[in-house]
């Protein structure tokens, strides 16, 4: 049985500190009165780390944004990154960024076993505009199980031909589970000191959930585990989004579920010149 903590990418929170000395402006503008950044430019870029991929047999196809495997049919994973940075309002609604699609087809032969995915985050004050924080990256592990389509019950514990198993047993992904809120600080130089913000990442489509014990066991990880089960003979897309708040998010934002992906602790301090 795999151990999720041992198999994880040694989830070490990345701490970045940026201190820029300067002379503060003679008087704070009205939009700086509360010292809060109202809008952020958020850049998120995801890629597969092909050097980390493990196949169940012979090597298959892997590139930064797409993976494919199988004989007699082709299954795979595709990453769709946003065209550019998105604007996120502080204490506003979640804003979509990265999407991941599983192309699930009946196959034989070698399949994906595991791969690491790297997410890189860049935060820049947009309103009022100011200098951005350095980019920070985190690698996290995806464990995958290509399940026998004809089993009953299925590897996920469900009944074959019902629900997600309607076309045969669904395949199983397990993803390193992240915390809900990641804190960072930014100082606009208004004389009020650095303000603390929290960035949280959510899966919007309702597919990311705690998995049954049977599904965790099938992948070879300990329960509880977090992941997806995807239907056979379909392409399923999971959409992720970000929110930035001035208080920790304690309940899911409407239209979202559990947070996942980037586990970042960004400590940024900047003085306006």
Whereabouts are the PLM-identified features?
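Short, charged juxtamembrane terminal tails flanking transmembrane helices
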Residues: 271-273
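Short linear Ser/Thr-Pro motifs
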Residues: 24-25, 256
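Sec/Tat signal peptide C-region and signal peptidase I cleavage site
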Residues: 26-30
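A short, hydrophobic C-terminal helix/tail in secreted or cell-surface proteins
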Residues: 252-269
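Bacterial N-terminal signal peptides
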Residues: 14-23
């Amino acid at each position: 049985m795999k151990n999720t903590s041992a198999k994880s990418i040694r989830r070490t929170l990345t701490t970045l500190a940026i201190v820029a000395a300067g002379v503060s402006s003679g008087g704070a503008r009205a939009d700086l009165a509360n010292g809060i950044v109202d809008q952020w430019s958020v850049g998120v870029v995801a890629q597969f780390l092909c050097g980390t991929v493990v196949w169940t047999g012979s090597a298959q196809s892997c590139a930064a944004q797409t993976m494919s495997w199988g004989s007699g049919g082709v299954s795979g994973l595709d990453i769709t990154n946003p065209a550019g940075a998105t604007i996120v309002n502080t204490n506003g609604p979640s804003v979509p960024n990265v999407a991941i699609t599983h192309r699930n087809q009946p196959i034989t032969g070698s399949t994906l076993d595991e791969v690491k995915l790297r997410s890189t985050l860049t935060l820049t004050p947009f309103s009022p505009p100011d200098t951005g924080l350095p980019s920070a990256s985190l690698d996290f592990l995806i464990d995958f199980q290509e399940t026998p389509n004809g089993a009953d019950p299925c590897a996920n514990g469900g009944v074959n031909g019902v629900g997600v198993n309607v076309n045969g047993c669904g395949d199983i992904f397990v993803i390193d589970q992240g915390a809900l809120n990641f804190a960072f600080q930014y100082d606009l130089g208004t004389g009020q000191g650095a303000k603390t913000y929290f960035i949280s990442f959510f899966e919007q489509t309702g597919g990311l959930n705690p998995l049954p014990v049977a599904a965790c066991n099938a992948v070879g990880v300990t329960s509880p585990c977090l992941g997806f089960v995807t239907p056979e003979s379909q392409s399923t897309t999971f959409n992720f989004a970000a929110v930035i708040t001035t208080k920790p998010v304690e309940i899911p934002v409407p239209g979202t579920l559990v947070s996942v992906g980037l586990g970042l602790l960004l400590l940024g301090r900047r003085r306006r010149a």
